[in-house]
Structure formats: structure tokens, C-alpha cells
């Protein structure tokens, strides 16, 4: 085994962290057994080659990583895998690179299965000791490429240390020559272990395992344990956790000491325990920033504490059942359902002295419970549980009391979390006696709802999760009669956590704890019914929990009031606005389960909270008041009673005064004013829907003022909450108008109608875009009786909002909301013959269509990107809604040319480049096509369209995926009516920036053109449409630049080769003229580069077109931008080599030489001379300098 050769290349293990949704393993066996055997069999062939070696290593790593969650499936295969790899290691002829590779594979297996399981498979005969020791000795600790080799060899050596023979028997004669003695095996192993305890790689962990196995041997502990412990304590004393080397040294030493005090016999370790504890105190590890050092310190402290105490099972502990399954079954056959817990009043060891070091150990463990890192707290909690199990009952009870002290609101969330973990450990081990359950359950119930706001986030998720773990542990630890007094409180708390907790992990933990209690205790009310609804997966969706599952559980009377109380007490004032809104909506649902309780107990509390100085409490309570009032109205309405039958006069007056109280206290101003406005708008909406007896009251004027003021000042509201505020105000206005502004059935109060319509129409001309948005939607939300007689005036105002003018070209959002308002008004007033001021009819439908179709060409862009998308999307939706409305009522109002324009515009949008927008357009297109109640009249090419887009394919096609959308949409190019618009959309997609969009749109277009190559008429029609698009969009860079790129693609691909057989083909002549106009005087680099490519491709057309194309290229060779000159020269060079017939063979070499040898980014005077020379060679006239106007 030539391990002293150069190490093979390799890197440390790769740990990929997947941040997406993780899928649990569901494997049944090691399915890659044959592949793995073949992979290991090829190691001798691939170890030398870099690429093959890395591929084999990576493939093996991928295979093994699949079993990271189910490593036990590897157990039947571990032995043959290890044998194959160790055969390589033990083969004397194996080169060093192959041996290192074998150890890398061994390490990967160890990483997945764990070294403890893997260790027993290593050969551990007496004959293996020296060869393994020799292998370790020749390793280079500084070789960073072979750390896996050292790690595995140290583990192997730790196994060989377990041989039941004295190591001195292996030494033989230590005197090799007179005066020279070689080291004994015992000394060599100890030296190696000590040297690797202070290295910086993974071998340090293996060295700690080696030390623990070696030092605790009977023949080694007598002579080496004291020496090693002295060396270790000196290392700890000299090292500082403030330096990197100090951290490494302390880490290795602490690991070794912790392992020794774990595996060593108590009588061997006890003499040194106090000394080690004193040294550990001096290290001040709790002050270190290194989590691992603090964790190892806690681990070592608890092992020292366990060394101080005799290993015994506390006779006073609480026991449920028996460890023996046979004993438990025997109890059942005797008719006993439970075993009484055994509590001795006298403990045989009660009088034993507890060593003084125990108190210091427990003190340090209690400090560890409050550590800032979870791993340290968890280790301390387990230490508390282990120590308490060996203490007398009185002292263990003191420990429990100290743990309960962690649950003070002066303590941090870290202390609460550590306390929960410790209680769970104590309960799980039967060390929490039933007499303590009253105190423990009280703090656990608090921990289940622990949630503290800290800055911009909250803390407490881990506390609530650990509290669920405590409940889970108690279910397994105690008999049902012990927990019976607490069943109601625990079950309600767990249900509340499972349904109303903000964090998904806590909801799932609570659900699991509830399930454990139902299964093991059997005393939770309606446990099985609740579990089937609130299972692990169901509680994953927060909205579903708050709004659906909560209603089901509240149907059981034991849980109804606790759930409502929790929402009012904790969630209505929660720091997260989403939780407050969900809590209010949940109260709406639960109020219908307990109307009397909600009206008499909950509602007064909520009303008192609306005046709280706390912003979150005010916001949540106002929302809750609105929702509960509306819920009570629904109940009353079912019996044709008013809501006042549930709410007394004091409650009604309290609701009415909320707005005025907030206004008087100026709480509508500032940052908090946003929340207050939104909440009161919801209140207005719900109270209006609840038909509160406020008609004619001054509060209506106050509500109207708030709605108007909110809509007028939307631009002052933060952008992230603006949409929610706008929606709330508009919804409030709609409900308010419907309930309080109707004078007679179907008739509006004329004064109010005049004031509202006039004021809102005036605001549509406001210079603030957001104000226009708000009042546009407000007009759209007005009920029909307020629009009666003023419809034409309102539509005219909204059409003006949708019109793009130079002053408001960037107001895309106001145009979008104006379109939405028009569509909503049409739905409100309906379609019927009559005056245009009453409903949609023949006199105004064309004007509405004109406004909607005009917005289909809105391609406004600003710093936010293509904001015109919002307008076009709203226009398509509005067109669909209006057309379907007309088709249902009066299809004769849909004119043929209007329907054609709608379908063509929507088809164009369905072929453009933005994925989600293309999907929406396709949805609209197919909805219009397949609508059959009745069918929409005048759809162009309906028969062909239904064949191209059958109803059966609608659900299966993902139009947002370019690979599925473009092959289908390009089929419309064969229909003359749609060709222009679809080709226009495709051009924009094909010349875009997204790789997948470009690829699939290009492929689809080429497939279509390939199909029409044999049809001159179809090809001519297509080329004419392409030129028409170019002509219509000349100097429109949104279209012209992508069009030039498209032309480059189709010309390069030979789509128009049929035209090259004719000199000066009309297509080529017109295309050349349009390209010249497009790039003339342009400074757009992208446009010029695309133009160069097109001119180069046009030299394939014979005749004057070729000469003119070459002339344009020669002009570009002297362009003012050096980049353009260089690119032109490069592309002309390639073109002349591609189309060899363009230049005569006698001058081709000279032309190519000039193009390649000239520095085209040099001064123009130099470049111009070479350009003129090229003109002469190519046979085109030399360009002449045109004097600038006014030049002297």
C-alpha cells in the first residue's frame, strides 16, 4: 500500500442545501445495488483519470445521498461494499491515488449510515493492529486532499484497539540496536491520537473516538489515563477560544474528554472528575461565541456530573406500565388496565452524600438551558434529565423548581425554550411526579401561546414548538387519571395551537401532540373526529386552518369558547396584520356557532379595545367588530329579524361612534392612519351590509368623507398597502351607497346622486394618478340606481381616463382601473334597448368597444418595465366580459368588424413574449371561441379555429410555457384574417431577450415557413404581411428592432431562398428600402447591429438589390462608432465567404485581405481610404461626403 506517493486529487464532501419544498424518502430497498457494485469494481480503471474519477465519485455520492433519510436500507449491503473497498486498501500493489479514492468512497458510506454502525464491520483481528497503525503513521496531516483517508484510518484503528489482549504482547523486543529503543505500540497510538486531536479537519472527530476506546482499555488506563488527562487539561488551560487554533485545540480536547467520561468506567474516571470540572470552570466556555465549544462544554459537564453520582434508577420516579410487553399483556389478562405508580416514601440511598461537584454541574446545566443556540440548550436539557434520574427525590424536586424558574416573563425566549426541553426530558423519564403537574401544566399552557415582538420580527416559534413536545412527552409518560384534571385545558390549548398558530411547524407539532394524547390518553373530547380533520397535512394551510378547520372544531362545545377567547385575547392584537385579518374573519365564522356568547361577552370586549393606544389592537378589534356584527346579522336575517335583536343599543351606539372617536383623536393621520382607514372602511362595508339603523344619521356623512379622503390621498399611502386600501374603500362605498342612498326602491336621492357623480367625475382629471385610480374604481362600484340617468356622462369620463395623452402617458394604472370600471358598470346596468343613459345599448356600445380596443395598443414602458401590460390585460378582460354580456342578451349588437378586431387583437397578445400575459390572452381567446350560450357571432374562421383549438385541449395546454404555446399559435398564420396580428406578436417574441421564448417562437415560425415553401402564393402573402408590419412600425423601436432580428433569422435560415432566383424581386427591393429608412441617422447600437446582419443577408438577392446592400455596408464601414465599423467588416468578411458568387474570384482574395487586415477602429481618414478601395473592388460607387448645412 504505497500511501506515501502523491495524494490523489479530491475535495471535501459536498453538502447541498435545498431551499425548495423537500420531499420525504419513501424507498423500500437499496435499488442501486448492481450499479454500485459495478461502480466499485471500476475504481482500479478510473482512479487515474481526472474526469472519470470525479464522475464516479459524484455518481456514488448521489446514490448514497438518496438514502440519507433511510440509511438502514443500506445495512444488508454494507459488508460487501466495505470488503470491495478494503480489498483495494489492503492490496500492496494499489497506488496511492487508488487507495485514497477507496477511502473517499468509504467516507461517503460512513457519512450516510453513521460511523457507529459502520465501525463494527472493520477487520479487527490482532494482525490488523500494526498494518493499520503503520498506515496512519505515514499519513501527512497537512494533506488537504486526503483527509477522508486519515479519518477512516483513525476510525479503523479505534476498532482494533478493542482487541482483548494486552498491547505489550505485540511489542516484542523494543531494543533494535544497543542504546536504541523503538516506541511501543501503546505509545505510538497515544502519540498519533494526541497529534490528530489538534488538526483542523474531520480527522479530529475520529481521533476523539480513538482516544475514548484506547484510554479506557484496562491495560492502558493504569499507565496512560492520568498522563493523557494531564495533557488534555494543560491544552485547555493554554488555549483561548478567541483564536482559531485555540478553538480547534479546545474542540478536539473537549470531544476526547467527553467520550472518555462516557465510555470509561465510573470508578476509573471518578478520581479525575473534580479536577476536570475545575479546569472546565476556568475555561469560561459560556462566554465563547463558538456554539460547538459551548455544546461540548455542556456535554462534558453532564458526563462529569453522572460520574459523581452512582448509576442507579431512582426508586421514587413515576412509572407507567412496564418495559416488558409480556408483563403489560399479563396485566391486561388479569383485568387491570393500568399499573399504579410506585413511589417509595423511603429511599435506600436517601442518606447518601451528594458530592459537592454535583451542585456546580447542575448550576452550569441550568445556565446552558438559557444558551443562545438550540443545540446547547438541547444538550443541557438532556443533561438535566439524566442527572435528576440519579438524585434523591428532594434534590430532584429542587431541580424541577429551578427549571420552572425559566418560565418568567423577565426571562428571554431562549430560557423558555430550554425550560420546555428540560421539562419534556424530565417528564419522559418519569422524574416529574404528579404532584408537580399543576405547576408544570400552567407554564406549558403559557408557552403554547408564547409570542413576543422583537423589532421587525417575533420570537417564540421555538418555544411553542417545544411546548408541543412537552405535551407529546406527557401523553406517553402519565396514566390517564393523572392528566384527567388537565385534559380540558391541554386539549383546548393544543387545538388552538394546531389551528391558530402563525407558524406551520408549530401547527403541525400541536397536531402531532394532540394525536399522541388522543391515542395514549383516550380522554381528549372528540379526539378522533378532530384528528381526521386537523391532521398533519390539513394544518399546513394557514387560511384553511383559520377559516375552515376552526369552524368544524368549534362545532364541539368544549372548544368553542376557548377558541373565541384566544382569538380575542391573542390574535386580534397580533403584530402580523395578516393574522389580525384572519382572526377577524375566523371570529365571523365562530360567532355563528356561539351567537349569544359573541354578542354578550365578546362584543363589549372588542368595542373597548377599539380605543386602545396600541395600534395593532385597535386595528384588529375594529376588523373583528365589523366581522362579528355581520355574522350576527346573517343569523338574524335567516329568521327575518334585524341585527339589533342580537346587539343591544349600547353596542350599536359603540359601533356608530368608532369613526368619530378616531377622527377626534386624529388617528387617521400618519403611518398608523393607513391601518385605521383600512379597518374603518371594512367596518363601513360590513355595517352597511348588516343594515344597521343609521339611515339619515350624521355618521353616514362621516363615513362618506373617510372614503372620499382615502381615495383622494391614495398617493400618500405606502405602495405595498395601496391596493388593499383602494379595494377596501371601493367595497365600502358600494355597500354604503346600496344601503343608505336609495330613496325609493330603484331610485336614488337626487341631491346625493348629483353630488357624488359630479365630484367623482371631477376627480378623474386629478393630476395624481392614484387619485384617478381610486375614483375610477369608485364610479365602477356605484350601484345601478345611482348611475340611472347619468350613465353616458360617467362612461365619457372613464373613457377620458383610458385615453393616452402626452401629459399622462405614464398613468398606466389609472388607465387599467378605468377599464375595469367600464366593464363593471356594464355588468351593473346590463344590456337593454333604450336610452344610452340607462343601460348598454346600440347607441353607446360602439363607443365602449372603441375605448376598450384602443387600450389594446398600450405598450407604455417606464422604470418598472412594460407597464402597458396591465392596461392590455384589463382591456382583454373587459372586452371578454362585455362581449359575453352582449352575447347573452343582445348578440345583434356585436358587429362583424368589432368581433374581428377583438379576436385579432387578443390573438396578437397570445403570441407575445410575456409568459403569464400570453396565458391570460389565450384564455380570453379560447373563452370567446368556445362560448356557446349562445355562440358569439361573426368570429372569423370559427370552423378552422375549433379544429385548431378543440375544447378537449383547453385544460391540458399550458399557454405560459413557450414550448406549448408557440407551436399552436403559429397555426393562425395560415388564416388571412389573423396573419398580420399573430405575425406582429411573433416578431416581438422572436426578437426578445428570453432564451426559451426566442427558441420556441423561432422554431415554430420556421416550421410554418417550411410548410409553405412549395406554395408561392402563401409565401408571397406571408412576405407581404411581413413588409406591411415593417412599414406600419417604421421607426417604432419596440417592433422594428425585433423585426430586424427576425428578418436576420429567416434570411439566414433560407426561408426566402425562392426569391433569390429572380433579380430585384419586389420583396427584396421593398425590404431594402425599409431597412435603409429604419437605420438612417440612427444612434441605437442594437438597431444598427441588426441592420448590418440584414444587409449582409440581402447580398444573396441578385441585381441592384445586391449592389445597394453592398453600398449600405460600405457606408457603415465608415460609421462614426468604431464598434459598428468593426462589426460590419467582420460580418461582410463572413458573408463573402458564404456567398462566393457575390464577388469575382479574381478580386475575392484582395477584398478579404482588406477586410481582415484593416484596423477598422482606427481614425476615419485611414479607414475611409480602405473603404474606398473596397468600393472599387466590389464595383459599387464610392460614397461622397455631404457638406453640413451652413458650413463655411
From Swiss-Prot:
Changing residue 937 to R: In PEBAT; decreased interaction with TBCE; decreased interaction with beta tubulin; does not affect interaction with ARL2. Changing residue 921 to T: In PEBAT; decreased interaction with ARL2; decreased interaction with TBCE; decreased interaction with beta tubulin. GO terms for cellular component: adherens junction; bicellular tight junction; centrosome; cytoplasm; lateral plasma membrane; microtubule. Changing residue 475 to T: In PEBAT; decreased function in tubulin complex assembly; increased protein degradation. Changing residue 1122 to L: In PEBAT; severely decreased protein abundance; does not affect localization to centrosome; decreased interaction with ARL2; decreased interaction with TBCE; decreased interaction with beta tubulin. Changing residue 374 to M: In PEBAT; severely decreased interaction with beta tubulin; does not affect localization to centrosome. GO terms for molecular function: beta-tubulin binding; GTPase activator activity; protein-folding chaperone binding. Belongs to the TBCD family. PANTHER family: BETA-TUBULIN COFACTOR D, TUBULIN-SPECIFIC CHAPERONE D. This is Tubulin-specific chaperone D. It comes from Homo sapiens (Human).
